[in-house]
Amino acid sequence: MLRQCARWVLTRTRFGRGCRRYGSCSPSASGDAGEARAYFTTPIFYVNAAPHIGHLYSALLADALCRHRRLRVPGSASTRFSTGTDEHGLKIQQAAATAGLAPIELCDRVSAQFLQLFREADISSTDFIRTTEARHRVAVQHFWGVLEARGLLYKGIYEGWYCASDECFLPEAKVTRQVGPSGDPCPVSLESGHPVSWTKEENYIFKLSQFREPLQRWLGNNPQAITPEPFHQAVLQWLEEELPDLSVSRRSSHLHWGIPVPGDDSQTIYVWLDALVNYLTVVGYPDADFKSWWPATSHIIGKDILKFHAIYWPALLLGAGLRPPHRIYVHSHWTVSGQKMSKSLGNVVDPRTCLDRYTVDGFRYFLLRQGVPNWDCDYYDEKVVKLLDSELADALGGLLNRCTAYRINPSGTYPSFCAACFPSEPGLTGPSVRVQAEDYALVTAVATLPKLVAGYYNDFQIYKALEAVSSCVRQTNGFVQRHAPWKLNWESPEDAPWLGTVLHVALECLRVFGTLLQPVTPNLADKLLSRLGVSTTERGLGELYFLPRFYGHPCPFEGRKLGPDTGLLFPRLDQSRTRLVKAHRT
């Protein structure tokens, strides 16, 4: 395996620097499949309540995917990332009335909370869209006009179960009965558990029934369109059932806080259709330039809105003559001590408190390290402290401190690598050879780590990418512990070459870890790489040529002065910061 790894690096070296890129050599690992542009989106978040950690988790997943793509494909012009707020609908209309505010006043207030949270959490979005913006109204009404011109909308009586909380109609199969507070049967949504009522009114209706087979073909031809796989299969299963036509408007007398149907002020466009079009608004729809970004789109969404994004939205796009999005990444939810977050339970965790308590990078790392898209993840404060102290403070921070401490590295430089001490061929012997079999396993693991991590990002398994990095950090600590550089003497002709080699290998490993952690912990990674003396132009995946001296090539860092010591990489969370994060009660 080591010889294969060496050949992999050396082959690319013969063709020049640009071919030594771990992240961009393999399209399957990059996730871009050769596309020149990439457009990442979060859902736009409903402004009926303050943001919670589930909202932040969606934004962090998108942010990490986007940042990793920027490491692979330098140049901000090729990557776009949007988030924002969903501000129309009956719930906003009612919440504003209850608060004694105009709807736009409520929207301004809560949208600002989301914007502030994302700034504090270092979400690197390029666009923040609000559905109350004039540009969005233009896009929605144009999109409606295209559907109408294509004969896909008709006016009729729509009758069925309506869920006010979810603002959607439900077929009979998606409704069940539960015993209500009065002891009587109460109809509720099977999917959300929210109450439903029978509603009959005249609406505009979209011919969704025409798109069942086109959607099945789309998913059949694009097996990675929806990730993870269980959600892809769930959508295929939904499509085995009949797709009834879909109401896409409400009476203006009932819902006035929204975008009017063009040419018919008696109807307001349904909030979920209005909201979905935001992805087109951001890239300039209906102007022709939007096609340079569409459909190179990756939607990051929660599982509760899967049907809207994986059935309704692709059908609407196909109906408008547009291609469905490139990828839909789906994640599950966060619970608190095993319970769903709820204002009524008083267990909604305030993400801004967590960012302050555990640091921005610490809380980013926790959510992305512990969050598994396939199933719900449980939050409790002790878990945060244990993870961050173990992996960031002790393992990673301790490794950096060991290798840069004055006692072990008095010159404050990137020491030289001695090929005689650490030959590239395992099993060689000689008076200078001190390497052990486990050390070759470490080199192989770290050399292949960037490609492994790229594959995990492509598969929407960021938690596995961080698990792989953490595993290599542990291996590197084992390497340092095994060879105990603090017991070696720089003044000894026998010790000095091996001491320099041990530190060189460990610092090279740290450089890889710092580079790969940039999408998740940008500030911590910057601090680590700056301490190693790695300039900002040497931090992309194209520059991540690991341990070149091992393969007989020059190392640009050898002999370079380390950067300034700015203190602990990540201080352990002391008792004053381990108090339970109080629930944000509203």
Curated annotation (Swiss-Prot):
Molecular functions per Gene Ontology: ATP binding; methionine-tRNA ligase activity
Positions of ATP binding: 343
CDD domains: Anticodon_Ia_Met, MetRS_core
Motif ('HIGH' region): 45-55
Keywords: Aminoacyl-tRNA synthetase, ATP-binding, Ligase, Mitochondrion, Nucleotide-binding, Protein biosynthesis, Transit peptide
Pfam families: Anticodon_3, tRNA-synt_1g
Primary location group: mitochondrion
GO cellular component, one term: mitochondrial matrix
Lineage top rank: taxon: Eukaryota
Motif 'KMSKS' region per UniProt: ranges: 340-344
Any one GO BP annotation for this protein: methionyl-tRNA aminoacylation
Transit peptide limits: 1-46
Entry similarity comment: Belongs to the class-I aminoacyl-tRNA synthetase family.
Protein's recorded name: Methionine--tRNA ligase, mitochondrial
Species of the source: Mus musculus
